[in-house]
Amino acid sequence: MKLIKFSSLSGQIAGILEQELDTACDYREGQRRIYAHAVDFADFYKKHLEAEQQCETEEVLLSSAGLRKRWYAAHPSCKEGDTLQYALDQIAEFKPDVVFDQARVLLPVIGDLKKKFPFIRCTATWDGWIASEPARMHGYDLYFTCVPEILEKHVAVGHRCTINPFGFETSILNHIQVPESRTNRVCFVGSLSSGIHNLRNRVLNELRKEDVLDWWIGNIGQGLFTRSKLRELAYGNFRAFRNNFPFERDNRGKLYGLEMYQTMARYQMTINIHGDQVRNIGNMRLTEAGGVGTCQLIDWKPNAAEYFKPDEEAVFFRTVDELKSKVRYLLDHPEETRNIGLAAQKRILREFSFAAHVSRFMKEVKGFLG
């Protein structure tokens, strides 16, 4: 069996990773250099599927213009086109049985894809966005997501959808240093947007006032007139607009991949707050932070225990005051904080590794293929 997977990264991260490519490196070497940063899913599907001899796998990072040019240079019979054409050319060349379109680049042509390429037996996609519109995503055989509310929306429009929790790639631990004693206190790594992260904004602002928090917020800038300030004004969120000034002044920037894992591993605790519309926990940070053994402070949801035992493998809170109280307690009891993080790590490595994530994916694919 052969599988091709299409993925994409944000423009900012993709641009930074492009710097890894020089004139001397070809397509395969370029892939190796970019995936070595372990950003998002990287090439972890290929790693596990081929290690377990389940199927030959081709990973395609659509957002890398440098990789695209190198691929076409190695395939002179193909004329370089846009992102969709690039994906179609990759399919024509690789001839996969299974197409996992995580980037959803094939959506405009998904209805006719099997007619165009009769060797394709299964198409799948991923939806992790709470505000997505499944009624506009028809055509794939399988749909995967991370939380029940997204699954419910897909099932309601007739999609065959499955929850597949995120997984932690255990080999990351071979590329970072996890200190025996963590002296840094509390960190937050992520984004901050009006209309989506109002609770997150309040929590971070309160912890900032407590002088215990360091933050890396990837979607805010620095200065008087920034995109983030204009965004808050557009939403009429004047409290967030006011709060942005100190956030931007002391913001440490965007973190991704190995650098993100290494940073979280140096802290006793990290804040993990879901979007305002999310009813259940299920984001990537659960496995990322848990995988490096950092004690997580998570906004409580009804399915919390499906991931972590409260107060044993993670610390959950319902109100900002409760969070502040628990942060003070954990700072006064560093050994207990450390043990919670290590217990979470054991749970992640046992139940939520990336190998387990890939195994769940393939179980659904094989079930569809019969």
For each predicted feature, which ranges?
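Hydrophobic alpha-helical packing elements
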Residues: L323, I340, H357-F361
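Conserved acidic donor-binding segment of nucleotide-sugar-dependent glycosyltransferases
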Residues: N283, A314-V320, Y329-P334
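Internal alpha/beta domain cores that form substrate/cofactor-binding pockets in large enzymes
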Residues: A38-F94, V99-S132, R136-D141, H159
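C-terminal alpha-helical cap of glycosyltransferases
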Residues: F354-G370
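Nucleotide-sugar donor-binding catalytic core of glycosyltransferases
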Residues: M1-V60, R68-W71, L142, C146-T287, ...
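A short, well-ordered alpha-helix in the C-terminal region of glycosyltransferases
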Residues: E336-R350
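Acidic, glycine-centered active-site loop in nucleotide-sugar glycosyltransferases
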Residues: A305-E313, R318-T319, S325-K326
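Acidic-and-aromatic substrate-binding clefts and catalytic sites of carbohydrate-active enzymes
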Residues: D101-P108, A131-E133, K254, Q277-I281, ...
